[in-house]
């Protein structure tokens, strides 16, 4: 039905007759000549119909937005004065000779113009129309190019694309599972996988030493801009490769993606330990485009007569750190109050500040609500440590170390955006040497990555003797403050795996009930293995400049995990529930909806 895509027609086709199909992006009648912008997934081309062919011209005059049409015409160069440099096809146009309406379009329920606003609900309800818009179509096409490039690289590197089950068993991976009732085993449930973690480890035990899969994963968790109940991972696992080798291979793949698809040279990724990232940036996924760093000042403030500073400065578990924001002294008191309120979201009890109005005037050039507690030596020490200049603002964080890191890390990001401090387009890095465990609110321990991550350089006995000192052989790839992917070396012997379960409070009976198959498999010559999983949606979001992963998924859910297009989720037929042995407990929420 067509000779090429609309967006592919160029000056090399001048003088040729082409047949194109697509949708009417815009139609206008200018002085007896109809100009038609025809659009398909590859772009837009201008078609011109004049009255010399009255039958075709009359049909062209009836066209409206989103009519689906077939066009035949002659490619001709535009005069220099009419070249449109904003269009790929802006040097040419099609002189229309034939026109067939393949399907008409009713008045549209959403605005198709990129400059017109549609609500998120409207866009998702009429997603098939929203996806026709060039900026959306471009992202979906780009996503396809990413997956093709990933497959090509991994296939060429000897990896095997192997599918793993979707109906599986619940595993403790940090979020709620989506459950699927079994008809044949009434009262029992499958779980949709949060990741293929255990199956890909079992594939290593099966001898398939290089595995990958572009796979759907499911997590029933609270949603944010970068979260969806179903999402896609680029899942990778290898045997007989160290963490350094896995990092090198996946870094090579990532650099290739950016070079091939964006012509961006990311260069070699620097490595930073978790401890250094938290100390300098207050985050385990630091945005290195932001030049601000947390600066420790507990030694300067440990003797001041101000408990807010003094107590954490002398507490082994406390921390006092500052941010020095260039030009920040221009913030008003109201704006500083907004910063303080923002810090409380992340656990801070308040926010002390110091304005450097005039460095040459000593204490007289300093403005701060806590200045009365600070002598000249302390102020000079702070100014020297932070290298503050006239016009700068110093923000103080003083509390338990984890609260200071989280609150000051959040303020660092906010200040970086507010003061336009971000420099450089792409700043990748590896974050390594994570703690094996982190404390829970009830005094227990939680695996920082997952329970199958191996510790570095210790025995099971040493791990159980002091689990909080253990460092995991884990690694995260971070780009511009976003975690692209995370992975680790896995535990490959049953003694170490059982020790980790005990530390996490998973007793032997529970471990055997949930993971007996894994513990059994570990007894039969399991090879050393390691892997990594990338968030495909997040990678495409960053590479295309989208603000949400919803804009790089064809049919995403809303922030309440619903699909306005299909009205999913919905109520099941009562007969189906009886067959499944499932009884719905009535609540006020679902009672109203069923009525």
Curated annotation (Swiss-Prot):
Q: What is its EC number?
A: 6.1.1.12
Any Gene Ontology CC annotation: cytoplasm
Name the Pfam families for this protein. GAD, tRNA-synt_2, tRNA_anti-codon
Q: Which GO terms describe its biological process?
A: aspartyl-tRNA aminoacylation
Q: Which domain of life is it from?
A: Bacteria
Q: Which residues bind ATP?
A: 219-221, 228, 483, 535-538
The question of whether Aminoacyl-tRNA synthetase is a record keyword is answered with yes
Q: According to the UniProt record, where is the region Aspartate?
A: 197-200
Single GO term (MF): nucleic acid binding
Q: Which UniProt keywords apply?
A: Aminoacyl-tRNA synthetase, ATP-binding, Cytoplasm, Ligase, Nucleotide-binding, Protein biosynthesis
Give the UniProt subcellular location, in the record's own words: Cytoplasm
Binding sites annotated in the UniProt record for L-aspartate = 173, 219, 449, 490
Catalytic reaction equation(s):
tRNA(Asp) + L-aspartate + ATP = L-aspartyl-tRNA(Asp) + AMP + diphosphate
Q: Does the keyword Ribosomal protein apply?
A: no
CDD domains with a match to the protein in the record: AspRS_core, EcAspRS_like_N
Q: State the PANTHER family in the record.
A: ASPARTATE--TRNA LIGASE, MITOCHONDRIAL (PTHR22594:SF5), ASPARTYL/LYSYL-TRNA SYNTHETASE (PTHR22594)
> What family is this?
Belongs to the class-II aminoacyl-tRNA synthetase family. Type 1 subfamily.
As for what it does, the entry says: Catalyzes the attachment of L-aspartate to tRNA(Asp) in a two-step reaction: L-aspartate is first activated by ATP to form Asp-AMP and then transferred to the acceptor end of tRNA(Asp).
Subunit and partners = Homodimer.
The protein's matches in HAMAP family, at most eight in alphabetical order, are given as:
Asp_tRNA_synth_type1
Q: What is this protein called?
A: Aspartate--tRNA ligase
The organism of origin for this protein: Shewanella sediminis (strain HAW-EB3)
Encoding gene per record: aspS
């Amino acid at each position: 039905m067509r000779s090429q895509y609309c967006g592919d027609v160029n000056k090399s086709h001048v003088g040729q007759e082409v047949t194109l199909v697509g949708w009417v992006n815009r139609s206008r009648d200018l002085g007896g000549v109809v100009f038609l912008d025809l659009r398909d997934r590859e772009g837009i081309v201008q078609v011109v119909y004049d009255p010399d062919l009255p039958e075709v011209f009359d049909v062209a005059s009836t066209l409206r937005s989103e009519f689906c049409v077939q066009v035949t015409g002659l490619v001709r160069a535009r005069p220099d004065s009419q070249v449109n440099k904003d269009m790929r096809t802006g040097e040419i146009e099609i002189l229309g000779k034939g026109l067939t309406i393949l399907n008409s379009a009713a008045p549209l329920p959403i605005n198709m113009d990129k400059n017109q606003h549609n609500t998120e609900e409207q866009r998702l309800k009429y997603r098939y129309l929203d996806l026709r818009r060039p900026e959306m179509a471009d992202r979906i096409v780009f996503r396809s190019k990413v997956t093709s490039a990933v497959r090509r690289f991994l296939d060429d590197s000897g990896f095997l694309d192997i599918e793993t089950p979707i109906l599986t068993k619940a595993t403790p991976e940090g979020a709620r599972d989506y459950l699927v009732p079994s008809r044949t085993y009434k009262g029992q449930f499958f779980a949709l996988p949060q990741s293929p973690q255990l199956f890909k480890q079992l594939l290593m035990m099966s001898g398939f030493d290089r595995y990958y899969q572009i796979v759907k994963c499911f997590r029933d968790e609270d949603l944010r801009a970068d979260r969806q109940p179903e999402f896609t991972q680029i899942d990778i696992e290898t045997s007989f490769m160290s963490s350094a080798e896995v990092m090198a291979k996946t870094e090579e793949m990532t650099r290739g993606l950016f070079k091939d698809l964006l012509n961006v040279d990311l260069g070699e990724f620097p490595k930073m330990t978790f401890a250094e990232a938290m100390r300098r940036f207050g985050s385990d996924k630091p945005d290195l485009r932001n030049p601000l760093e947390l600066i420790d000042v507990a030694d300067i403030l440990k003797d001041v007569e101000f408990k807010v500073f003094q107590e954490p400065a002398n507490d082994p578990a406390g921390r006092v750190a500052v941010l020095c924001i260039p030009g920040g002294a221009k913030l008003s008191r109201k704006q500083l109050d907004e910063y303080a309120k923002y810090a409380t979201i992340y656990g801070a009890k308040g926010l002390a500040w110091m304005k450097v109005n005039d460095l040459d005037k000593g204490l007289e050039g300093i403005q701060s609500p806590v200045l009365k507690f600070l002598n000249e030596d302390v102020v000079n020490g702070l100014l020297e440590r932070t290298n503050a200049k006239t016009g700068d603002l110093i923000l103080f964080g003083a509390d338990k170390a984890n609260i200071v890191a989280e609150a000051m890390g959040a303020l660092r990001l906010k200040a970086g955006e507010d003061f336009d401090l971000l420099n450089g387009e792409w700043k990748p890095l590896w974050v390594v040497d994570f703690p094996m465990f982190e404390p829970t609110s009830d005094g227990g321990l939680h695996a920082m990555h997952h329970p199958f991550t191996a510790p570095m350089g210790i025995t099971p006995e040493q791990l159980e003797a002091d689990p909080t000192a253990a460092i995991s052989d884990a690694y995260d790839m971070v780009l511009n403050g976003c975690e692209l992917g995370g992975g680790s070396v896995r535990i490959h012997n049953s003694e170490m795996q059982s020790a980790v379960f005990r530390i996490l409070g998973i007793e032997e009976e529970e471990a055997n009930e949930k993971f007996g198959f894994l513990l059994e498999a570990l007894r039969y010559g399991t090879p050393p293995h390691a892997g990594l999983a990338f968030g495909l949606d997040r990678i495409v979001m960053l590479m295309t400049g989208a603000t949400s992963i919803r804009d790089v998924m064809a049919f995403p859910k809303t922030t309440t995990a619903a699909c306005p297009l299909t009205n999913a989720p919905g109520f099941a037929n009562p007969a189906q529930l009886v067959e499944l042995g499932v009884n719905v407990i009535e609540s006020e929420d679902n009672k109203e909806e069923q009525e």
